[in-house]
Amino acid sequence: MSKILVFGHQNPDTDAIASSYAFDYLSQKAFGLDTEVVALGTPNEETAFALDYFGVEAPRVVESAKAQGSEQVILTDHNEFQQSIADIREVEVYGVVDHHRVANFETANPLYMRVEPVGSASSIVYRMFKENGIEVPKAIAGMLLSGLISDTLLLKSPTTHVSDHLVAEELAELAEVNLEDYGMALLKAGTNLASKSEVELIGIDAKTFELNGNAVRVAQVNTVDISEVLERQEAIEAAIKDAMAAEGYSDFVLMITDIVNSNSEILAIGANMDKVEAAFNFTLDNNHAFLAGAVSRKKQVVPQLTESFGA
């Protein structure tokens, strides 16, 4: 019997890596499954900081499940097939642990599926450790905490669930870190954009959404200075246009998020800019506009685009 691969979404962020890493451990300890954690991309700088801090080896990167001899997969931090492994339609989805909308998803067989409207997939996995009476090792606690901090911007994002505060406190204690100090260090590690090429920058944290027949790419970068990113606008737009031509995206929306002041600048290019402007009730000037208080793609960008596109 081949191993069940456990992984997060393409262009993995910290929650994708952390939740899959922890769920792989839980699957073996609590459910007796023969699993292996893998990743659909290399860790970004924020995730690398967490992995290094807690002495965790990055999961190996794969592109196909069948190429690894696997016929079954477990998805964490995503469920939409266009965000998953290349041959997702050719394998059996054994389980899903997620905190996003459910869309473009169907299976031939029954499966384990746990989806909750909380701040991170890591929050759900931690709760499952407790439910099954499995002790959380320090390194796993640290990674789960990192996933929660990353997705909620240290519990400041509107996606933060009331239960996430207690989860963060408990995980910080298990990981033996100060929540605020470690949280800020983690987030700042992810804002080093100067060393990134424009191609890398628009792919750090990007997901594709099928909206009423349109392939809309929504990417996000975190920074402490939006103006520094906009100084590279011409080169960023060139990279975006190349990606659109290569991948067939109808529209590309880049969130440039200020993690200190909790605002974003939206840079958008594509065939449906009228719908993008209507979604956020703003007017793009030189392809970008300010979106006050916006820090969450999941709650403050994708639902608005979905409604505006009539999806």
Swiss-Prot record:
Keywords: Cytoplasm, Hydrolase, Manganese, Metal-binding. The keyword Hydrolase applies. It holds the Pfam family DHHA2. Transmembrane segments: none annotated. GO terms for molecular function: inorganic diphosphate phosphatase activity; manganese ion binding. Its main location: cytoplasm. It is an enzyme of class 3 (hydrolase). It comes from the Bacteria. It is found in: Cytoplasm. Mn(2+) 2 binds at D15, D77, H99, D151. Binds 2 manganese ions per subunit. It catalyses: diphosphate + H2O = 2 phosphate + H(+). InterPro entries: DDH_dom, DHH_sf, DHHA2, DHHA2_dom_sf, Mn-dep_inorganic_PyrPase, Oligoribo/pAp-PDE_c-di-AMP_PDE. Its EC number is 3.6.1.1. One of its GO terms (cellular component) is cytoplasm. The keyword Ribosomal protein does not apply. NCBIfam families: PRK05427.1. PANTHER family: BIFUNCTIONAL OLIGORIBONUCLEASE AND PAP PHOSPHATASE NRNA (PTHR47618:SF1). Belongs to the PPase class C family. This is Probable manganese-dependent inorganic pyrophosphatase. The lineage of its organism: Bacteria, Bacillati, Bacillota, Bacilli, Lactobacillales.
